[in-house]
Amino acid sequence: MDPTVGWIALLAFFVVSIALVVWGRNGF
């Protein structure tokens, strides 16, 4: 498995979790 794939998955997970937190705070 390419290490880059792991980094992309980790980054995507981080971005999604941040987006969900911001989204939740805005009351959507």
From Swiss-Prot:
Location(s) in or outside the cell: Cell inner membrane
InterPro entries the record matches: Cytochr_b6-f_cplx_su8_sf (IPR036143), Cytochrome_b6-f_cplx_su8 (IPR005497)
Q: Name one GO molecular function term.
A: electron transporter, transferring electrons within cytochrome b6/f complex of photosystem II activity
* A GO BP annotation: cytochrome complex assembly
The UniProt record lists the keyword Acetylation = no
Q: Topologically, how does it sit relative to the membrane? A: Single-pass membrane protein
Give a Gene Ontology cellular component term annotated to this protein. cytochrome b6f complex
The transmembrane segments are: 2-22
Keyword Membrane (UniProt): yes
Origin: domain of life: Bacteria
Keywords of the record: Cell inner membrane, Cell membrane, Electron transport, Membrane, Transmembrane, Transmembrane helix, Transport
Which Pfam family is one of those matched by this entry?
PetN
Instruction: Describe its function.
Output: Component of the cytochrome b6-f complex, which mediates electron transfer between photosystem II (PSII) and photosystem I (PSI), cyclic electron flow around PSI, and state transitions.
* Entry's family note: Belongs to the PetN family.
Quaternary structure and partners = The 4 large subunits of the cytochrome b6-f complex are cytochrome b6, subunit IV (17 kDa polypeptide, PetD), cytochrome f and the Rieske protein, while the 4 small subunits are PetG, PetL, PetM and PetN. The complex functions as a dimer.
**Protein name, per record:** Cytochrome b6-f complex subunit 8
Whose protein is this, by species?
A: Gloeobacter violaceus (strain ATCC 29082 / PCC 7421)
Q: What is the lineage of its organism?
A: Bacteria, Bacillati, Cyanobacteriota, Cyanophyceae, Gloeobacterales
Q: Which gene encodes it?
A: petN
